[in-house]
């Protein structure tokens, strides 16, 4: 069972103003946010969670660039998966079964996919998008 400091049910959220990724426990009757990462990422824009490896994946933007990174819930093993030619990634979704990550980039006006290990990156859609943002993966169950 995946846990953050003993918490098994939680909501993850990003705060771009505070440069942080946070969580709220749903295991208790009161809700207080706790910080997972702060200051190590510049303007986080989207988060998703992989329960298979217990990693948080997040997109972020900086001055003139952006990226897709991940880390374990215990704040270790922070790594950047995709950085080159990533500008303003504003949405991401994990394919837990296929071990892929999909993201939108409103700077490059594309939707891309890559493996969760940072390999096999490719563009899915590059024409006809003005400001792609949120993305949801509708995976078949079963």
Where would I find each of the regions flagged by the language model?
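Short loop/turn segments immediately following the C-termini of beta-strands
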Residues: 16, 52, 61, 106, ...
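Short coil turn/linker residues within repeat-based beta-strand modules
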Residues: 18, 28-31, 63, 75-77, ...
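Surface loop/turn motifs at the tips and blade-to-blade linkers of beta-strand repeat domains
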Residues: 4, 35-40, 81-85, 124-128
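Beta-rich catalytic cores
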Residues: 43, 64, 88, 107, ...
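Structural motif
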Residues: 18-25, 64-70, 109-113
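Residue-level detector of Asp-centered blade-edge/turn motifs that repeat once per structural unit
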Residues: 5-7, 50-53, 95-98, 137-141
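Residue position within the beta-strands of beta-propeller blades
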Residues: 13-14, 57-59, 102-103
């Amino acid at each position: 069972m995946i846990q953050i400091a003993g918490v098994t049910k939680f909501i993850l959220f990003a705060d771009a103003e505070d440069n942080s990724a946070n969580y709220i426990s749903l295991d208790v009757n009161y809700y207080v946010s706790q910080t997972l990462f702060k200051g190590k990422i510049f303007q986080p824009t989207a988060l998703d969670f992989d329960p298979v490896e217990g990693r948080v994946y997040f997109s972020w933007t900086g001055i003139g660039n952006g990226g897709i990174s991940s880390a374990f819930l215990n704040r270790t093993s922070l790594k950047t998966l995709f950085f080159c030619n990533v500008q303003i990634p504003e949405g991401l979704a994990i394919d837990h079964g296929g071990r892929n990550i999909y993201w939108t980039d409103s700077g490059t006006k594309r939707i891309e996919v890559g493996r969760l290990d940072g390999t096999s990156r490719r563009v899915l859609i590059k024409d006809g998008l003005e400001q792609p943002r949120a993305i949801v993966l509708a995976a078949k169950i079963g």
